[in-house]
Regions:
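Short, solvent-exposed loop/helix junctions and linker helices
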Residues: 12, 93-97, 151-152, 189, ...
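Structural element of the ATP-grasp superfamily
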Residues: 103, 162, 199, 293-294
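N-terminal Rossmann-like NAD(P)+-binding domain of SDR-like oxidoreductases, especially those catalyzing
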Residues: 1-184, 311, 319, 330-332
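Short aromatic-enriched loop/helix-cap "lid" or pocket-rim segments at secondary-structure transitions
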Residues: 45-48, 127-131, 186-190, 227, ...
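Alpha-helical structural signal
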Residues: 19, 100, 178, 196, ...
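C-terminal substrate-binding subdomain of Rossmann-fold SDR/epimerase-dehydratase oxidoreductases
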Residues: 205-332
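Hydrophobic alpha-helix immediately C-terminal to the catalytic Tyr-X-X-X-Lys motif of short-chain
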Residues: 157, 161, 165, 195-199, ...
């Protein structure tokens, strides 16, 4: 690391949901932070010491932002909810592959101390996620490989790139597999939002009594992690000595209908669920096995879904005053 008393950390995707929160967390924990994105944060000003507006699909921009950095948290990605990622395979694979390769190469050239890559539970084989009563997914379950098309495949490819850069160039890499992150200051409309944000928006916009549309039959299951747990977990994993991919999520498995009922309960409204079976709903079940996370970090996410939905719903409801309801998307 540099000789500065405070190490420099770069957060890519700092204009996005997780990146914006991570910048604030790192600043609160004594780091100097450079953020980079193609856009500024949408809902709140950044806490970063520096913020660069750069397109990371160009190597020269990746070299610029990684210069003099001790740590790189690479969160930048072309992503969205189930509707977006199932309809945009080529664009997602193209954009993310360029960013991931160029960020690794630039970090190597600039002698970055450690590089953390944000992967996804979408790397896990579809065949292990065919039942709502899914067995929690272990890190080793990613192989033999059968990831989700597009987004999941490029994430798994980037995980291997991280491994190769560590083996061949001694770039110390860390890989985090996120499981459905939610919270305030995240995208809640436009098609790129995840299920908790979309559900909060729909309920907030609905009349009481009234109804909301849910994609699929509502029986598909997921676990959801609150943003505060997410950024703490990212920081802990970066500081750890563990070099292989790690799940980062809760193991509190709920159905999409149960998620809806939690949001409705927090809202205090009387709302019925109407299911649209023609819409994409993703895999039938997905849950995080946190056995290795607990073993490595002696820690795991602590915030329950209901506790996290309270501030999330409150924030989204405040954003959607006079808004028109849209469709609920399925979970990732």
């Amino acid at each position: 690391m540099s000789k500065s008393l405070k190490p420099w950390a770069l957060v890519t995707g700092a204009g996005g949901f997780i990146g914006h929160h991570l910048v604030s967390y790192l600043k609160a924990n004594g780091y100097r932070v450079r953020g980079v994105d193609i856009k500024l944060p949408e809902y709140s000003s950044t806490d970063a010491d520096e913020f660069l507006l750069l397109d990371l699909r160009e190597l020269k921009n990746c070299q610029t932002c990684t210069a003099r950095m001790d740590l790189v948290y690479h969160l930048a990605a072309d992503m969205g909810g189930i509707g977006y990622i199932t309809a945009s395979h080529a664009g997602i694979a193209h954009n993310n592959s360029l960013m991931n390769l160029y960020m690794l190469e630039a970090s190597r050239r600039n002698d970055v101390g450690r590089f953390l890559f944000s992967s996804s539970a979408c790397v896990y084989p579809h065949g292990l996620q065919t039942s709502p009563d899914v067995t929690p997914l272990r890190e080793e379950d990613a192989f033999p490989a059968q990831p989700e098309e597009g987004y999941g495949l490029e994430k798994l490819y980037a995980e291997k790139l991280c491994q190769y850069y560590m083996e061949d160039y001694s770039l110390y890499t860390r890989v985090v597999r996120f499981h459905n992150v939610y919270g305030p200051l995240g995208t809640y409309d436009g098609g790129r939002e995840k299920a908790p944000a979309a559900m909060c928006r729909k309920v907030a916009c609905a009349q009481s009594p009234g109804g909301i549309e849910v994609w699929g039959d509502g029986k598909q299951t997921r676990s959801f992690m609150y943003i505060d747990d997410c950024v703490e977990g990212i920081h802990r994993i970066m500081r750890s000595d563990y070099r292989n991919p790690l799940n980062l999520g809760t193991d509190e498995l709920v159905s999409v209908d149960e998620l809806a009922e939690i949001v409705i309960g927090v809202s205090g409204k009387k709302i019925a669920l109407m299911h649209d079976l023609t819409k994409p709903q993703g895999v039938r079940g997905r849950n995080s096995d946190n056995t290795r996370l607990r073993s490595v970090l002696h820690w795991e996410p602590q915030i329950t879904l209901r506790k996290g939905i309270v501030p999330t719903y409150s924030w989204i409801a405040a954003q959607t005053v006079n808004a028109t309801p849209g469709a609920i998307v399925a979970a990732e």
